[in-house]
């Protein structure tokens, strides 16, 4: 009789792992403590809730996360099914209606006869049986302590932040204009143009605004990909102009000119009734967010549906603990997945859950676990988190820097080079799947 598998945590990674197990005929006990016990960042009990942005970033094969998405589609990923079904306009990126997205994932998993849902907290590592731990960076204290004891080393951490969401009907449409950078895809973003004087006033107010106190927070402990806007602004007067307020490729169609700075708003739900402020992750006090962000042209009367906030994320010393199959080195049958392993980002977390779920299924079926080719985005992430120097281990997004370069003549054009790497990765994945996984 095939062994049942326990999956702890129904976030992006846990949901994907449960799906990969169930589609291979494996019985799954899926545990999720929400909504009985909430985290500092979640707002519902739905599976795969997106707590920060609603963007899954680029859909292009010239971008590593675009390659990762396409690989996951090839592997019949539930998270990619949900994202494609619940997407909202975002130019060349993939963004979703976060409520529809989490509901899609929840409905899919609860409808599967192989998956039994348990809405309860697990406070200890199961002592036996095949298990996937995917409790995320906001793992409850009791279980986090047990994981740390298992690691035999202190878990690492960084601070993550979310951007505010504003009501669409409170945006001044006479000031903002619709456009995607370089006109990629459809005109999907609302753009708030700033003159130099407006930018200088805003940047000065931002740097001097009062932040919320968070125990243990230091600016050095933020993840670069989710850096609070006020921390970024403090690095220099023009730092924001090369980051989230970069105006390049965003000419104002009203006068044909490129503004000095541009704040972008991205649609947050299918009804287009809410927009998030792109790149404005923050831990300013709520009153300060209202005061400072209403200085942005077009947002003078903005109504905040959700203010930005920050929370602490914990991750493991994976190079010392895990194999590239996401299985624990010192305990066969125990797998970890998601941001807690040191992959960073929604898609990356789901991708790790996909690999862990496939390998947990193989373990349950009495087959050998597999490691994905390092020439793929899935394989390169697993390789990075398990082979990098543990002393300098930091969370990592999907990146072409993690994937071996092309052999032969060097391609100078970066976009073309990246597309060729993606082409090779998808071919290698197809061959790997046919040889190792299509039993």
From Swiss-Prot:
According to UniProt, the reaction catalysed is: uridine(54) in tRNA + (6R)-5,10-methylene-5,6,7,8-tetrahydrofolate + NADH + H(+) = 5-methyluridine(54) in tRNA + (6S)-5,6,7,8-tetrahydrofolate + NAD(+); uridine(54) in tRNA + (6R)-5,10-methylene-5,6,7,8-tetrahydrofolate + NADPH + H(+) = 5-methyluridine(54) in tRNA + (6S)-5,6,7,8-tetrahydrofolate + NADP(+)
Q: Which residues cross the membrane?
A: none
For this protein, the Enzyme Commission number is 2.1.1.74
Top enzyme class: transferase
One Gene Ontology term of the biological-process aspect is: tRNA wobble uridine modification
Report whether NADP shows up as a keyword of the record. Answer: yes
> Which cofactors does the annotated protein need, by name?
FAD
Q: Known HAMAP family for this protein?
A: TrmFO (MF_01037)
Full protein name: Methylenetetrahydrofolate--tRNA-(uracil-5-)-methyltransferase TrmFO
Q: Which organism is it from?
A: Lactobacillus delbrueckii subsp. bulgaricus (strain ATCC BAA-365 / Lb-18)
